[in-house]
């Protein structure tokens, strides 16, 4: 069977070049006589893999020396708890609610302290990013938390919130390495990277060193203390070795393709193709305010649930898979992450035009 165009929100499409390299090395990684799946995380082979991955990531993102890079497990959902456990010194933090994942992080933080809603776009089904220029931040807040790209609803912060000097924590799960960022504007950047970077099972966290201390909330498990992981170079216990190996290959692919500035241009070009069609379509329509549209996740609807289902079914049969919207919102969603080729978006739009002609 030929490969399909995979529009899954995550785990998601990976560069074919990376998959081919991994396939070639599956039985024998660089003369080791072993697959990376089989080798010890304490081996020289894997030590080189994880160090090389960090080096390439630091180069791609221009990560300052006073930030630690951690390769972790547990998904973004576990990290929802790690943030307050490690950062809530005053037991108070501000959260901006722009979708399901910010809501879940907010609910988790409430377990550990006084989590305050600073702004929300729930009033319009999270179809926009609220004004974050003058948030009701108080002096005793330990940090301000955002989900920078909202995978389900298809919104993206185009400008970071004014945190009034407070530490900014950002979940970038679905926009990680899709464009250049100024790491120094954040205290913590993290994501479950099974969208733009690798397979499921790897969390990458970039944390300013002064925030990595023994001063965690009482009862914080040893494994969930960032200092435990930082002191052991992400090797306190067995890490997700194969996932890190694939991430490392994606980092090298991104560098080979020209880096994050080039990736942003490519991602903007792909998104424009799809959004331009949606803006003139008589059948399909987007669901997000134009100024807040994500380059990564594009939700759309026909306005008829039965027609939506028909579209998803026929698209799947035509080789455009995983277009069904998240179960909480319905409709459709095309996730066009960095590894999705422009051709995939162009062919999807061709199919949508054909479907519109037959069903409008």
Give a label for each model feature.
Residues 3-54:
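A glycine-/small-polar-enriched, mobile loop at the entrance of the PLP active site in fold-type I
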């Amino acid at each position: 069977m030929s490969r399909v165009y995979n529009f899954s929100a995550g785990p998601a499409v990976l560069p074919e070049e990376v998959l081919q390299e991994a396939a070639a090395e599956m039985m024998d990684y660089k003369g080791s006589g072993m697959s990376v799946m089989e080798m010890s995380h304490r081996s020289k082979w894997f030590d080189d893999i994880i160090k090389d991955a960090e080096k390439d990531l630091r180069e791609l993102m221009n990560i300052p020396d006073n930030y630690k890079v951690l390769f972790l497990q547990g998904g973004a959902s576990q990290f929802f708890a790690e943030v307050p456990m490690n950062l809530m010194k005053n037991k108070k933090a501000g959260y901006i609610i722009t979708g399901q994942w910010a809501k879940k992080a907010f609910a988790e933080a409430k377990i550990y302290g006084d989590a305050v809603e600073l702004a929300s776009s729930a009033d319009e089904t999270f179809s926009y990013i609220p004004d974050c220029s003058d948030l009701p931040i108080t002096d005793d807040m330990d940090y301000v938390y955002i989900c920078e790209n909202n995978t389900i609803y298809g919104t993206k912060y185009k400008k970071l919130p004014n945190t009034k000097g407070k530490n900014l924590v950002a979940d970038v799960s679905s926009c990680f390495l899709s464009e250049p960022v100024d790491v120094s504007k954040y205290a913590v950047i993290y994501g479950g990277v099974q969208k733009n970077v690798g397979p499921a099972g790897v969390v990458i966290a970039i944390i300013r060193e002064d925030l990595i201390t023994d001063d965690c909330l009482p009862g914080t498990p040893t494994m969930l203390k960032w200092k435990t992981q930082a002191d052991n170079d992400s090797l306190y216990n067995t890490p997700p070795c194969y996932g890190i190996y694939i991430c490392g290959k994606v980092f090298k692919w991104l560098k080979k393709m020209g880096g994050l500035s080039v990736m942003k241009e490519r991602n903007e070009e792909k998104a424009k193709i799809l959004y331009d069609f949606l803006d003139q379509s008589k059948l399909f329509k987007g669901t997000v305010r134009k100024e807040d549209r994500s380059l990564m996740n594009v939700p759309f609807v026909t306005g008829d649930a039965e027609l939506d289902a028909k579209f998803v079914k026929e698209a799947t049969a035509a080789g455009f898979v995983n277009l069904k919207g998240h179960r909480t919102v319905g409709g459709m969603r095309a996730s066009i992450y960095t590894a999705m080729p422009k051709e995939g978006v162009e062919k999807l739009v061709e199919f949508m035009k054909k479907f519109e002609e037959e069903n409008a």
